[in-house]
Amino acid sequence: MNVARLIVCALLALPVGWIAAVLVDRVPERRSLLVPRKPLRPSPRDLVVHLLVLVLFVAAAVRFADASLGTLGAFLVLFAALAALTVIDVEHYRLPDLIVLPTFLVSVPLVVVVSVVDDDPDRIRYALAGAALYFGFLFLAHLISPRGMGFGDVKLAAVMGLYVGWLGTDLQEALALVLWAMLLGFLSGTVVGLVLLVARRGSRPFPFGPFLALGTVLAVLFSEALVGV
């Protein structure tokens, strides 16, 4: 374990958590991000966002203890975005383009630059293949059932597939890990959906994005156990 990275990531989670909480509060209602927040007591939602960011950042520090700083930084970007989007989807049942698209536009050049700096340019190809696979699979699901699979989930899939595929040491491992991320996301979502159905709450809106995010996080953190990378 790299203790220095662990401490830095834990400290970094504080300002990033604050930024994520601002996004969660303002983006769904399209309020300006430039107006300072009033110094009010943190809401329970703010605390959830901060806790999610902290847990994910610490997990990233442990997972990427021996990776390059660029790789760690890139996954911190992903985890921060997933934390904010998860809370928004649970509360508003949507994944705003104002977070998803900038995350993708930042992530693609970030993946390219880090791969080149780390002298492993093949990873760029694996990342793009992962993004295409995840996006394509969910786009097909969206065409089959638009109400069951929203297009926000489809766009987020491109972001998640980019990062998950990036972890592969060859194309086969990259695609296998993306399939694992999808499987874990769909399984967790299906289980919770069945529980809600049994509890007679199945008629309520059901956000699927948080479960796709969970599957991605699990695939990233346990990639070695899943595909050996």
Residue positions per predicted region:
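A membrane-topology feature that recognizes alpha-helical transmembrane segments
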Residues: 1-229
